[in-house]
Amino acid sequence: MTFRLRAAQIADLEQLYEMAKLTGGGFTNLPADRTALTRKLERAEEAFARTYDDLGDDQFTLVLENTETGQVRGTCQMFSQVGQQWPFYSYRMTTLTQHSQELDRTVRAELLSLVTDLEGCSEVGGLFLHPAERAGGFGLLLARSRYLFIAMHR
């Protein structure tokens, strides 16, 4: 069997939709919703077709294709800049330390703070590999392909 990674296309919609149904829901990078998937594929095609180098709000989607059967067996995504169309929320973990001299006691508490510090940063999106292909090292290939893509387009 031979596989290749390539840019996702609108023609991949049905195969990606069938794979999305295998996620069990809640996987935002691969929703089991044809309309949402269509928009993601349109954004990916627009991103790959772009000829200028300015950073935009691009979403790049790659698919893992079995070249013998033409079947899409996995997918992964990258986002050039997050927080451009709507806020990108993340959490910052901090430690709050308080001391009481009267009680001679120090108390530390870990806090999560909602922040938007990562706006404008690139994001490595999720990946999904068809369950039948999970033992062949293809997950590692998909995972690393995102970083290779970013390195090629710095």
What are these regions (language model features)?
Residues 153-154:
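Short, intrinsically disordered, charge-balanced linker/junction segments flanking boundaries
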Residues 6-9, 65, 79, 125:
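Residue-level detector of conserved, well-ordered beta-strand and adjacent loop positions
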Residues 1-29:
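Conserved N-terminal entry element of GNAT/NAT acetyltransferase domains
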Residues 15-18, 43, 145:
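Alpha-helical elements of Rossmann-like donor-binding domains used by nucleotide-donor carbohydrate transfer enzymes
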Residues 80-126:
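Conserved acyl-donor/pantetheine-binding loop and adjacent beta-alpha core of acyl/acetyltransferases
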Residues 107-111, 126-129, 134-150:
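Conserved acetyl-CoA-binding loop-helix of GNAT-fold acetyltransferases
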Residues 29-72, 77-88:
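Active-site rim helix/loop that mediates acceptor-substrate recognition in acyltransferases
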Residues 3, 59, 70-73, 119, ...:
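Sequence-level motif detector for i,i+2 pairs with an aromatic at +2
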